[in-house]
Amino acid sequence: MGSGIWVLGFFLAAVGFAVFWNSLPAPFTFDDDHAIVINEQIRHLSTSLSPTEQGSPLAGRPVVSLTFAINYALGELNVRGYRLVNIAIHVINALVLFAIAARILRVRGVAKAPELAFAIALIWMVHPLVTEPVDYVSQRTELMMATFFLATVYFGASAAARHRSDGGTRPTVSVICCALGMACKETMVVAPIIVLLYDRTFSFGSFREAVRRRGSYYAALCATWLVLVVLLWSSPRGDSAGFMGASVSPWTYLLDQSVMIVRYLRLAFWPRGLVLDYGEPAHVTFGDVAPYILAVSALLAGTIVALVRNGSVGFLGAWFFLTLAPTSSIMPISTEVGAERRMYLPLMAIVALVLAPVARAFMARTSTVAFALVAGLLSIATFQRNAEYRSGLTLWQTVLDRWPPHARAHRNLAAELKLANRRDEEIEHLRAAVNDLPELRNALGLELLALGRNAEAADELRIYVRDHPRDADAWSNLGNALDALGSRDAALDAFKRAVAVNPDNGLSQRNLALQYLQVNDFDNAVGHAREGVRLTPGDPEAHNLLGLALIGQQNVDEAIAEFQASLRLRPANNDAAGYLERTLKATRR
């Protein structure tokens, strides 16, 4: 029996690495930039555990931050290293699930418990619905939380099976894992409840007996909630976490979740049409989603009834709803109506609920063939989903193809199209996004300006500065668009507004100086060019502009000094060399 379990475990790990191996070349995506690529905090191990800035993807998640710092120390931004760690963590989670399932099935007296537990772990591990936490690198938060969640349950259950109530090392390890999980993701908050339900269902038969036997252990597990409280206080998750800064009420968000839960269940049984980003919650009413609410309510009621009867079905139903609750109702990302990564732990319960009775209903050989077929089909689907992450362009196109289009998907696809130099298509998607994300209108204006569509650019930028009159850069962009149209006076007014809004913006000062230079107002040109040099002394172009303005004032000596200063800053590829040569020739020096 012992050697057989080791063989199954080795095979499980081998399949896991094989199925996800094609994800290794995929680039970083979406929030990976903020969590990893531009995150200075993970550049050193010593700073990785420090509190992060509010709103960071790693805020309140120092253990995950530490693993990213280790990745960076070993390979800097080589994405393969980060992805390999994610795959390894996922495989470890499958192995721990295998161990937990085998223990439960043995307690229930199920024949061939290791084989059925292996099937449960295998089907879950290769299911396409778990690809997001593995392939989306910064969602290592989900993976690591699940690792410590499962370890908390495993060591707690193991101690109970060995009749160790509050002593021994296993309960201690369980509590340590629980604390570490709290430092990975907020979903860990339900782990103490799951452990208590496990003991009541599989070890002691009642809550009273469980508390009598292991009361101090449960108290220690609950004490780890303090870790989460401290982390949330020291590194707030930002306005998008919870409902403090949400654009929808908790009630509306809860209504939306009924639709999403039904979709999650559909994806569990038919995992086609996976979506990376479902967009923001819809403003729905009870009547809009009544059928979904009835379906979810029926499942919840069935779970409660099964729990009262103290059965395995009740425990698995509770596992599903409790592990889904923190990110779907209690502490959600309120700007996301749904996320497939939320199903990472809940899917385990669904797989177990389906496979256990199916295995008992059919002969062993028939079940084995069926499991192999299902696992093979799911592995192929997962392999295909991994491939979609290898291109940001493909990934964001799938979002628009498979779900009602939303602004965030249009914005991100536009960014990928820009990288691919498909600028006209980029413009189309930016236009589709600006109504819901009006802050993109400035970017739209800039892209139109870059394409020479100056009138359209000016129109978009006028709307933007009307709504954002304190944005100095936008006023400068509008000035550039108007200047390109030949509207010099209007452009001058726009540049003046930019400087008035932010006189400490060196680029705004230089833009205004250049505009004055073009209309031969050399005194004003010199004044603003000097401000540009003062604010950006290390920019050779600032010195060049001041030099040209000084030439207009006939201040040749100072102009020569500015051109020379520019050349010292950038000896090569600098227009200052030509300016200096012409000035010296003109003055016969």
Regions found by a protein language model. Give the residues of each.
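Structural marker of alpha-solenoid helical repeat scaffolds
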Residues: R402, A433-D436, D467, V501, ...
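Structural signature of tandem alpha-helical TPR/SEL1-like repeats
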Residues: E388-T394, L419-A432, D436-E439, A450-I463, ...
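Alpha-helical, heptad-rich or low-complexity scaffold/stalk segments
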Residues: L548, G552, E558-Q564, R568, ...
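Polytopic membrane enzymes that build or remodel cell-surface glycoconjugates and lipids
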Residues: M1-A450, D473, N477, N511
